[in-house]
Regions:
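A short acidic, Gly/Pro-enriched loop at the edge of an enzyme's catalytic core
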Residues: 80-91
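Short alpha-helix
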Residues: 141-156
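Core SAM-dependent methyltransferase catalytic element
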Residues: 165-182
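A short SAM/SAH-binding and catalytic strip from SAM-dependent methyltransferases
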Residues: 91-103
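Conserved beta-strand signature within the Rossmann-like core of class I S-adenosyl-L-methionine
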Residues: 119-125
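A short glycine-rich, Lys/Arg-flanked "PGG" loop and its adjoining helix->strand segment in the class I
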Residues: 105-117
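Conserved alpha-helix/loop element of class I SAM-dependent methyltransferases that forms part
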Residues: 3-21
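Class I SAM-dependent methyltransferase SAM/SAH-binding core
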Residues: 25-81
Length: 182
């Protein structure tokens, strides 16, 4: 986690801090600092999947204590093919990864599949308007407005979808719930 993700981390922490005994998945954990911070303060089991083998190794080193006690389980994999059983997680979160997914609809379907009924999906992201102003975001980023992210989550079956502003209309946090039978 870097300075730019600090606000995103606080948003995720707000939603997972009361999940005592839960199973929580981080999609695209990068260097693993967010998992480390959350796992130190929350009595839950943390799982993570990241496409980069280098990041998996770095995050395992960063989370050595949690990995050694089996509180943190990290593995390489794609968000479009989550390597977990159906209805396994109480919460799934992702911080600034939506831009890099090959197939956003497939990832959202996978998140719904691995979430338990009543489980929440938390997705923090910077808006298209903000990213368009950054020179290093010219290519390799799928950029979305908050309305687009909300619509995609609803289309893929999430309920009670809310998008909250994190900072100056440039960063947002989406929260959606999996409800079966509706």
């Amino acid at each position: 986690m870097n300075f730019f993700n600090a606000e995103h981390y606080r948003a995720v922490k707000k939603f997972v801090c009361k999940l005592d005994g839960a199973r929580i998945l981080d999609i695209g954990f990068g260097n693993g600092v967010t998992i480390k911070k959350l796992s130190k303060n929350i009595n839950a089991k943390f799982y993570g999947v990241d496409i980069s083998a280098d990041m998996v190794e770095k995050a395992k080193r960063e989370n050595r204590d949690g990995v050694n006690t089996n509180k943190v389980i990290l593995q390489q994999g794609k968000a479009e093919e989550l390597p977990y059983n159906d209805d396994f997680f109480d919460t799934v979160y992702t911080v600034n990864t939506i831009y890099f997914w090959e197939d956003t609809a497939k990832v959202l379907d996978e998140v719904r599949r691995v979430l338990k009924d009543g489980g929440n999906f938390i997705c923090t992201f910077y808006t298209k308007g903000y990213l368009d102003k950054l020179p290093y975001c010219d290519s390799g980023f799928d950029k979305f407005t908050p309305q687009q992210v909300r619509s995609m989550a609803r289309e893929r079956g999430f309920h009670d979808v809310k998008v909250k502003i994190l900072s100056d209309c440039k960063a947002y946090c989406l929260v959606g719930t999996k409800i079966e039978g509706e």
